[in-house]
């Protein structure tokens, strides 16, 4: 059921892509080693994906734990909200064929924001997303997390890259990511 794969450190996108490429299953749930999921999460998410073939992503309510414990207040999902911010965390469930369709996680997103870029690539066609109304994801907050270390210069670089790569998407939703990067995420 589980395989241990050892690869040279090439960033989270490279590791996820390698693992997903080798995965034999139909459904994917990326899970970082320090996070946790509820025991019913996979069952609930896969049930929804099976029942609705047009559904692309299933995620859930979440809470943060570690340096502080609290409910993670995620904005409601809409395609226009996705253009401004990421409200879907890394451990949402989707079909492997959709990962293949978009070419996986972008390995250029080494410094961060890879999940937001991935969800834009996957969902920019306006596809369906469903949120399970129970806490099934537990995100560990650490003092030295990569996202906390992301400085303004790196953020600008990532946002500029995304604004070019997904220009059609951001234009359609009237978002200039490169100018408003401090309001995003």
Give each language-model segment a name.
Residues 1-6:
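Acidic donor-binding segment of Leloir-type glycosyltransferases
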Residues 7-23:
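Glycine-rich, basic loop-to-helix element that forms the pyrophosphate-binding segment
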Residues 24-25, 90-103:
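Conserved nucleotide-sugar donor-binding
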Residues 28:
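Short aromatic/hydrophobic "clamp" motif used to bind/position activated sugar donors
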Residues 32-36, 61:
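The conserved acidic donor/metal-binding loop of glycosyltransferases
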Residues 40-72:
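Conserved donor NDP-sugar-binding/catalytic core segment of glycosyltransferases
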Residues 71-82, 108-111, 127, 131-164:
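Nucleotide-sugar-dependent glycosyltransferase catalytic core
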Residues 111-118:
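Acidic donor-binding loop at a coil-to-helix junction in glycosyltransferase catalytic cores
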């Amino acid at each position: 059921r589980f395989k241990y794969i050892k690869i040279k450190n090439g960033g989270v996108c490279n590791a996820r892509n390698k693992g997903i490429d080798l995965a034999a299953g139909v459904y994917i749930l990326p899970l970082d080693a320090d996070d946790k999921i509820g025991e019913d999460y996979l069952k609930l998410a896969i049930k929804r994906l099976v029942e609705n073939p047009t559904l692309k992503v299933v995620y859930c309510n979440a809470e943060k734990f570690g340096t502080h414990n609290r409910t993670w207040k995620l904005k409601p999902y809409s395609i226009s909200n996705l253009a401004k911010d990421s409200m879907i965390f890394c451990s949402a469930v989707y079909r492997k064929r959709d990962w293949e369709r978009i070419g996986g996680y972008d390995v250029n997103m080494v410094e961060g924001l890879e999940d937001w870029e991935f969800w834009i690539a996957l969902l920019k066609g306006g596809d369906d997303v469903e949120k399970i109304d129970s806490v099934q994801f537990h995100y560990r907050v650490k003092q030295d997390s990569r996202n906390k270390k992301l400085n303004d210069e790196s953020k600008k670089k990532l946002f500029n890259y995304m604004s070019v790569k997904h220009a059609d998407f951001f234009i359609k939703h009237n978002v200039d990511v490169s100018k408003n990067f401090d309001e995003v995420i």
